[in-house]
Amino acid sequence: MVVAMGIGNVLWADEGFGVRCIETLQQRYQFAPQVCLVDGGTQGLYLIHHVQAASRLLIFDAIDYGLPPGTLRIIEDEAVPKFLGAKKMSLHQTGFQEVLLLAQLTGQYPQQVVLIGCQPEELEDYGGSLRRVMKAAVEDAVEKGADLLRRWGGMPVPRTAELAPAEAVTVPHLALDRYEAERPSPRAACRIGDERFMPQDL
């Protein structure tokens, strides 16, 4: 099986890059039956069965490479866990680095692993969307991903009809257009986190 997975948290602006890549990839292309698209979100260790089942694994994620925002880098095979753990931006990266290491320990690890990572611009805007430079990077990342999946026998074919909501691997009510259109104002919703879980003045 070929697995293409986007990881990250769409609630924290550019950290949602990986999930938005998978969302766009599925909206744009149909694939051969052996290709599995996964919205990995921040599930961490719960994703291990996808990794163990994959003969080839493609990962999309926002990665702090220390480069200009929007810069894409493609990392392969044994270097992938190192980059996921080098400059952790959130807990999901720690979790997915562990997923890869545990899959190796079980002896069920993909023959090939490729990470398409993008340098984020903004990570501290709760409820925010991708910045403009990241949206442009999604387009490039998706095409690079489709080319790779084609080489892996995934046979991407442009969709001739709109993807039905029930078929979406991402959460329909968090789809990019709707997410941006329905975001409440700063006055109505805190921009630095969920107020229900923030310390209150005594």
Curated annotation (Swiss-Prot):
InterPro entries per UniProt: Pept_A31_hyd_express, Pept_HybD-like_dom_sf, Peptidase_A31
Range of residues in the leader sequence: none
Origin: domain of life: Bacteria
One MF term in the entry's GO annotations: aspartic-type endopeptidase activity
GO-annotated biological processes: protein processing
Gene3D superfamilies reported for this sequence: HybD-like
Pfam families with a match to the protein in the record: HycI
UniProt KW keywords: Aspartyl protease, Hydrolase, Metal-binding, Nickel, Plasmid, Protease
Residues the record lists as binding Ni(2+): E15, D61, H92
KW DNA repair (keyword) present: no
Role: Absolutely required for hydrogenase activity. Mediates the attachment of hydrogenase to the bacterial membrane; attachment is a requirement for enzymatic activity.
Family to which the UniProt record says this protein belongs: Belongs to the peptidase A31 family.
Protein's name according to its UniProt entry: Hydrogenase expression/formation protein HoxM
Record organism: Cupriavidus necator (strain ATCC 17699 / DSM 428 / KCTC 22496 / NCIMB 10442 / H16 / Stanier 337) (Ralstonia eutropha)
